[in-house]
């Protein structure tokens, strides 16, 4: 399975226009997704940021005819946004812990987050997360987190995580202390747009909202 991500910044006051225009092309768009074998497609919004995620069986799944449709839709929707990631190009994968991916999503909740990197901190962010991958020694994570990936473009970081609610539990004191230590250390290289660590910092950020989803 191949994973893909993209991101845009909404122009001031244009989020409603973006939603309305997306609704007008939604049926045609999902038909192209289905024909191209693209699944688990979703777009998320926090503040003026749009983050999209989807999956396919291979990297090159959209033929030239369908790609032309996407370019035309991009022009139609693009009155409302500017690209953060490079259009139609892979976004940089900063971290992954795919674990055991649940094919059945009925008991999945999502954690999707957005942060802004301190200028010049992208490689340090990658280094810290590479260390987490190495520490797993190839062990497959059973859950509750699954299909977890973190991406970066334009100085932003975007996280996508599928959480198996049947395996969730209250944090132990050790887990809580470890999480607080990690997140406080990360604050020296990034700031949050979503509300994931408000319980640690005492700040108040917006909760991310799913704009659309296609299975």
Positions of predicted regions on the chain:
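Hydrophobic pocket/interface hotspot
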Residues: 22, 52, 113, 125, ...
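Short, glycine- and small/hydrophobic-rich beta-strand elements in well-ordered beta-sheets
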Residues: 30-51, 55-59, 137-166
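Short, structured motif recognition centered on aromatic/hydrophobic residues
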Residues: 5, 26, 112-114, 157-160
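Short amphipathic alpha-helical segments
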Residues: 14-38, 121-145
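An amphipathic, aromatic/His-enriched active-site/gating alpha helix that lines ligand/cofactor pockets
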Residues: 32-39, 56-90, 143, 163-206
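Short glycine-/aliphatic-rich beta-strand segments at the starts of folded cytosolic domains
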Residues: 2-17, 108-123
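Surface-exposed beta-loop interaction hotspot
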Residues: 92-116
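C-terminal edge-of-domain segments
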Residues: 97-106, 204-215
């Amino acid at each position: 399975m191949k994973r893909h991500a993209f991101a845009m910044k909404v122009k001031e006051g244009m989020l409603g226009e973006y939603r309305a225009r997306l609704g007008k092309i939604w049926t045609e768009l999902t038909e192209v997704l289905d024909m191209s074998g693209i699944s688990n497609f979703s777009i998320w919004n926090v503040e003026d940021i749009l983050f999209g995620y989807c999956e396919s069986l291979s990297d090159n799944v959209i033929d030239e005819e369908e790609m032309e449709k996407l370019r035309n839709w991009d022009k139609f929707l693009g009155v409302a946004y500017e690209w953060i990631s490079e259009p139609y190009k892979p976004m940089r994968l900063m971290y992954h812990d795919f674990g055991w991916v649940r094919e059945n999503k009925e008991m999945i909740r999502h954690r999707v987050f957005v942060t802004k990197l301190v200028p010049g901190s992208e490689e340090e962010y990658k280094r810290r997360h590479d260390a987490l991958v190495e520490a797993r020694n190839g062990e497959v994570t059973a859950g509750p987190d699954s299909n977890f990936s973190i991406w970066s473009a334009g100085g932003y970081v975007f996280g996508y995580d599928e959480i198996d609610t049947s395996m969730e539990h209250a944090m132990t004191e050790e887990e809580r202390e470890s999480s607080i230590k990690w997140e406080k250390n990360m604050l020296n290289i990034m700031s949050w747009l979503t509300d994931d660590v408000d319980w640690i910092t005492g700040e108040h950020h917006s909760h991310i909202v799913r704009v659309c989803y296609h299975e």
